[in-house]
Amino acid sequence: KLGSDFQKGLEKLLDGNQSVSLSDLKKQLTQKHSKVVLGEIPIHSASPNKLYDHICKSVLVMGRLYNCGKCSKWHTSMASAFVIGQDGIIVTNHHVLAKDEGEILGAMDNEGTIYAVEKVLAANQQDDLAILKLRDAKLIPMSLAKPANVGSDVWVISHPNRKLYMMTKGMVSRYHMILNNDRKPGRRMAITADYAKGSSGAPVFNRKGQVVGVVSSTSSIYYSVENGKKENLQMVVKNCIPVESIHELIQK
């Protein structure tokens, strides 16, 4: 039901001219830094079920309203985001905004309330991060942790393939650099917690509910390539953005 409510809410924002166009938001992706007042809300170590109940209040569904060109209906794409400031300051991936298709971008909380994106505060393509401000949003923020050590337990709450608010567990497996599409290096933190399409922009957090990273992408490892076709999938590496990349975008 939340999924259908999200599309209806985005259509209402568009019809009521209550949102900034996606094309205008994309023009703001050149903003490199912004002053952000973080919501430092401490959480003592908690059981996974209590963590889930608490963190879900800070995790958002992000989505673009678009027309496929093959029918007259609107469609939505879904990604993830999370709150870091009480006045509607959120984090998601740069690539969530940078894709071409779409009229508007919006967000929805776990109770089904829809929010328009007001503006882009800061963004970095290499680190695949964007910090946005939602209009008229008073949400519960997550706090940012220090960098997590390799071997640390981590959790993810995201929306893989429209399966909203799914929680998975793993550990930090390594830190490394990758080359982006423009051949510029970006920092990454690999984890073993599962996620899939629709999880982009989701928080990676520790047992205290503090953010240690942001879901970004996956990289599949195949045993062989025959006639240009990859065969025998062995492993899927989960690449995330380390928390220090968020700190570099914000000016406290």
Predicted regions and their residues:
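N-terminal activation segment of mature serine protease catalytic domains
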Residues: K1-F82, I90, I246-K252
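Active-site substrate-binding loop(s) of clan PA
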Residues: K50-L51, F82, E118-L121, K133-L164
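Extracellular/periplasmic catalytic domains that process cell-envelope and extracellular macromolecules
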Residues: Y52-I55, H75, V83-I84, A122-Q126, ...
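Active-site region of chymotrypsin-like
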Residues: K57-W74, I114, A130-P141, M166-Q251
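Catalytic-histidine neighborhood of serine endopeptidases
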Residues: M78, G85-D127, L134, V150, ...
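A residue-level structural signature of the nucleotidyltransferase/glycosyltransferase Rossmann-like core
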Residues: A81, G88-I89, L164, K238
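Short, surface-exposed secondary-structure boundary micro-motifs
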Residues: N93-H95, H159, S217
